[in-house]
Swiss-Prot record:
Residues 1-49 form a transit peptide. HAMAP family: RuBisCO_S_bact (MF_00859). GO terms for cellular component: chloroplast. It comes from Flaveria pringlei. This is Ribulose bisphosphate carboxylase small subunit, chloroplastic 7. Pfam families: RbcS, RuBisCO_small. One of its GO terms (molecular function) is ribulose-bisphosphate carboxylase activity.
Amino acid sequence: MASIPATVATVAQANMVAPFTGLKSNAAFPVTKKVNDFSTLASNGGRVQCMKVWPPLGKKRYETLSYLPNLTEVQLAKEVDYLLRNKWVPCLEFELEHGFVYRENARSPGYYDGRYWTMWKLPMFGCTDSAQVMKELQECKKEYPQAWIRIIGFDNVRQVQCISFIASKPDGF
């Protein structure tokens, strides 16, 4: 024999929810045909004729900001200040032979693209002033005048490299 509360609950459930019978009809939604109007999109079509492709021969690129002219000491110090404001740890690396991307140990592109640079001393944990980094840069340039030298910023919380740019190149590059 069924108890009274079970009978009441069954009746209440049947009245509360209607069974699912399928998808709703599209007739309830207004249908408007949109015209493909591209006049509001940005276009540089009129300027394409005056654009040029950057010549790849004799103008190799390295890291971030490498498309710009060589940075001055003041500009480098500002980049290091940016790195320090973001609480990244500065580090210097140098390379004596291959300043460009090349593949010696691996044939597939990746984070390091088959190249490893030598670290100058240790990462500068606790560095708070760009003058400290610039002093280390000058020492590295004095020790290895024909080296590519880059400044890297590491985020020690996320444990990733956040910025990397060339600070010095050998003569002729």
